[in-house]
């Protein structure tokens, strides 16, 4: 009798994706982040569902409904903080996952890579709208500033912004629709993640050496299931350390002040995971230019496969490219720091230089260094 696991239409899909999947024998811990992102998404959907049971998306009661969740609902405080810090863990895993793709040349799977970029945009949109929901000062002013950027679009800008707001400012209509979108997007993200996996399984996983591993494959289960469980335990440990010891470490104290359209906070800034893009936005004095730079800071990932000039796929054996990669990481950390600073003398120029360097590394230096490495190897 043939195994039902391999024949039943439903279990067959699971079997071919997570059990009998042929995987390279040498993939490192950097390949754990895909499954960790899946776990993050599940945590966010579950905690978000329970929060939505008690949350009210009306300007008069939104802030107090979040307070009510934390004070009166059984374990509401832990659900709320798991959701807020779960978003931070989600973005840490996302950045490491994208960084792994850049380092090891995984972007050569163009379909998988492009779906990944769409996923990144979708998760960023979801996180932004989620930050508006508690209706604190940063929620309100963050929503005002970021949606207002769309007014930089020529001709239709102002109409577009007012259409998104549902009025002449961020108000009831805006909050209600943001809640609706924030609820639906994670399910769209789940579907996109399935497509992301579908395309990945067409080619199989890449590996640290960047060399095809068809001659040396091992089954996903038990080798990588147990490895993923270890990764999941470490992820949950880190999340719970944040939630139970320093739940407000990554948040902004201003968001504990109810939204007030008449009082602007001294420093309007987004959550930490958007600061690098916010710094790039602010480093350009022109409004439309800043918006374009902001979008391009993520969209630039889409042309990386076209700029791959090296004869090798991975950076494992390319020390010069490695130096550039880590310079890029340092540059992104610098941008993250600058994004949280006020617009004053030293920070403005540092932000502008870091922004220029970011695009220079990705668009100019990486392809040139790759060609130099090819020539050094007489290829």
UniProtKB/Swiss-Prot annotation:
Its main location: mitochondrion. Heme b b566 binds at residues 97, 196. Heme b b562 binds at residues 83, 182. The keyword Electron transport applies. Coiled coil: none annotated. Pfam families: Cytochrom_B_C (PF00032), Cytochrome_B (PF00033). Binds 2 heme b groups non-covalently. It is a multi-pass membrane protein. One of its GO terms (molecular function) is ubiquinol-cytochrome-c reductase activity. Gene3D superfamilies: Cytochrome Bc1 Complex, Chain C. The chain crosses the membrane at residues 33-53, 77-98, 113-133, 178-198, 226-246, 288-308, 320-340, 347-367. It is found in: Mitochondrion inner membrane. Keywords: Electron transport, Heme, Iron, Membrane, Metal-binding, Mitochondrion, Mitochondrion inner membrane, Respiratory chain, Transmembrane, Transmembrane helix, Transport, Ubiquinone. Its cofactor is heme b. PROSITE patterns: CYTB_CTER, CYTB_NTER. One of its GO terms (cellular component) is mitochondrial inner membrane. A ubiquinone binds at residue 201. CDD domains: cytochrome_b_C, Cytochrome_b_N. Component of the ubiquinol-cytochrome c reductase complex (complex III or cytochrome b-c1 complex) that is part of the mitochondrial respiratory chain. The b-c1 complex mediates electron transfer from ubiquinol to cytochrome c. Contributes to the generation of a proton gradient across the mitochondrial membrane that is then used for ATP synthesis. Belongs to the cytochrome b family. The cytochrome bc1 complex contains 11 subunits: 3 respiratory subunits (MT-CYB, CYC1 and UQCRFS1), 2 core proteins (UQCRC1 and UQCRC2) and 6 low-molecular weight proteins (UQCRH/QCR6, UQCRB/QCR7, UQCRQ/QCR8, UQCR10/QCR9, UQCR11/QCR10 and a cleavage product of UQCRFS1). This cytochrome bc1 complex then forms a dimer. Heme 1 (or BL or b562) is low-potential and absorbs at about 562 nm, and heme 2 (or BH or b566) is high-potential and absorbs at about 566 nm. This is Cytochrome b. It comes from Mustela itatsi (Japanese weasel). The lineage of its organism: Eukaryota, Metazoa, Chordata, Craniata, Vertebrata.
């Amino acid at each position: 009798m043939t195994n039902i696991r391999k024949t039943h239409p439903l279990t067959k899909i699971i079997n071919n994706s997570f059990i009998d999947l042929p995987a390279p024998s040498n993939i490192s811990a950097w390949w754990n982040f895909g499954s960790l992102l899946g776990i993050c998404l599940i945590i966010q959907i579950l905690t978000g569902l329970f929060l939505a049971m008690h949350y009210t998306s009306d300007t008069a009661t939104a802030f107090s409904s979040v307070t009510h969740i934390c004070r009166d609902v059984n374990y509401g405080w832990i659900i709320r903080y798991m959701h807020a810090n779960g978003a931070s863990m989600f973005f840490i895993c996302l950045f490491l996952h994208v960084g792994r793709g850049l380092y090891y040349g995984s972007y050569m799977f163009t379909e998988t890579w492009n779906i990944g970029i769409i996923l990144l945009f979708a998760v960023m949109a979801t996180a932004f709208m989620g930050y508006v929901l508690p209706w604190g000062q940063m929620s309100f002013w963050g929503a005002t500033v970021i949606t207002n950027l769309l007014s930089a679009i020529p001709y239709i800008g102002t109409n577009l912004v007012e259409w998104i707001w549902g009025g002449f400012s961020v108000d009831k209509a805006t909050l209600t629709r943001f809640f609706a979108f924030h609820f639906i997007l994670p399910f769209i993200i789940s579907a996109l993640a399935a497509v992301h996996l579908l395309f990945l399984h067409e080619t199989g996983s890449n590996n640290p050496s960047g060399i095809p591993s068809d001659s040396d494959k091992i089954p996903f289960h038990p080798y990588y299931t147990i490895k993923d469980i270890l990764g999941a335990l470490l992820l949950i440990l880190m999340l719970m350390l944040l939630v139970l010891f320093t739940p407000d470490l990554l948040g902004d104290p201003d968001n504990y002040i109810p939204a007030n359209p008449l009082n602007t906070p001294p420093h309007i800034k987004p959550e930490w995971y958007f600061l690098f893009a916010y710094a790039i936005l602010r480093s350009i004095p022109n409004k439309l230019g800043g918006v374009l730079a902001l979008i391009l800071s993520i969209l630039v990932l889409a042309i990386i496969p076209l700029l791959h000039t090296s004869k090798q796929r991975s950076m494992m054996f390319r020390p010069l490219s490695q130096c550039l990669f880590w310079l890029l990481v340092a540059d992104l950390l610098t941008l993250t720091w600058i994004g949280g600073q006020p617009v004053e003398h030293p920070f403005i120029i540092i932000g502008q230089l870091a922004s220029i360097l970011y695009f220079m590394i990705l668009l100019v230096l990486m392809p040139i260094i790759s060609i130099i490495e090819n020539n050094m190897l007489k290829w």
